[in-house]
Amino acid sequence: MYYPLVRKALFQLDPERAHELTFRQLKRVSGTPLEFLVRQSVPTKPVSCMGLSFKNPVGLAAGLDKDGECIDALGAMGFGFIEVGTVTPRPQVGNDKPRLFRIVEAEGLINRMGFNNHGVDNLIENVKKSHFGGILGINIGKNKDTPVEQGKEDYLICMDKIYPYAGYIAINISSPNTPGLRSLQYGEALDDLLAAIKDKQTELHQRHHKYVPVAVKIAPDLTEEELIQIADSLVRHNIDGVIATNTTLDRSLIQGLNYCEQAGGLSGRPLQLRSTEVIHRLSQELKGRLPIIGVGGIDSVTAAREKMAAGASLIQIYSGFIFRGPGLIKNIVTHI
């Protein structure tokens, strides 16, 4: 497989520069006859989830294609679903660089990107141009300069705009890189947000005559009590799914490694066990009342099976995709 050679070259570069270079090349082939250069044949293994039919259970997690620039090229690699974003109502540059770090020895990444994106309107134009045959999820967040108390308005603005174009909508309230965002996961703030989102979903369902499911993405850094409360809120508000988990602030598994002290969210293999534990506990609490999309450190067939055994109906990859390449998609779908 060619990817080890590509990876070796890319890993000589700054991580964000490598990402930009890769996406520049993918944009050139996306939606063109040159897509065959990245296409691979992946078995069809249909999964029904959130009322949708997925051609296979392996998806791309949000954060890689924030602006939906390479949907078709990524789709050609065999993903059953792709989640673009996180996107915000207005464009924003994100946090200062450098803001992305490879923990190569641990096959992890630390990012403090800060929802850098070109805004929801730009994303929609890119989605309109795409021809991806799988399910497209759109992940939404709030702008950094929107006060947390008014944060729900940003989610509602985004929902209003993306609803006709989304297969499902992911509500990101768990990024550690937007100040105050994670506070929306708790108590009255969560109930208030979920009630508003559910009302908006009902309104948009009637307006567009189609039902677009909503999933909420949660953090791994939750106590058992917090997890139980979140599960209860999701069920009470009839949310359609939960994505577990986002990146972690915990550094216990990468102590002493290069960049371990960098601020931001840690993903990849060091997150694997904790995210699986959260999925397992969530599954016990939810008792099948809403499905779980499992994400966090999936870099092998074994890791994917562990997520599904813990209770995930679908899985997503990101860091594992960076470290292992497109072959990981085919490998998991074939052997899961």
Curated annotation (Swiss-Prot):
Binding, substrate: K66, N111, R112, M113, G114, F115, N172, N177, N246, T247
Keyword Cytoplasm: no
GO molecular function terms listed in the Swiss-Prot or TrEMBL record: dihydroorotate dehydrogenase (quinone) activity; dihydroorotate dehydrogenase activity
Matching Pfam families: DHO_dh
Transmembrane segments: none
InterPro entries documented for this protein: Aldolase_TIM, DHO_dehydrogenase, Dihydroorotate_DH_1_2, Dihydroorotate_DH_2, Dihydroorotate_DH_cat, Dihydroorotate_DH_CS
Active site positions: S175
Pathway: Pyrimidine metabolism; UMP biosynthesis via de novo pathway; orotate from (S)-dihydroorotate (quinone route): step 1/1
Details of cofactor binding: Binds 1 FMN per subunit.
Keywords: Cell membrane, Flavoprotein, FMN, Membrane, Oxidoreductase, Pyrimidine biosynthesis
Membrane topology term: Peripheral membrane protein
Cofactor(s) named in the record: FMN
A GO-annotated cellular component: cytoplasm
GO biological process terms on file: 'de novo' pyrimidine nucleobase biosynthetic process; 'de novo' UMP biosynthetic process; pyrimidine ribonucleotide biosynthetic process
HAMAP family, A to Z: DHO_dh_type2
Task of the protein: Catalyzes the conversion of dihydroorotate to orotate with quinone as electron acceptor.
Protein name, UniProt field: Dihydroorotate dehydrogenase (quinone)
Taxonomic lineage from the root: Bacteria, Pseudomonadati, Pseudomonadota, Gammaproteobacteria, Enterobacterales
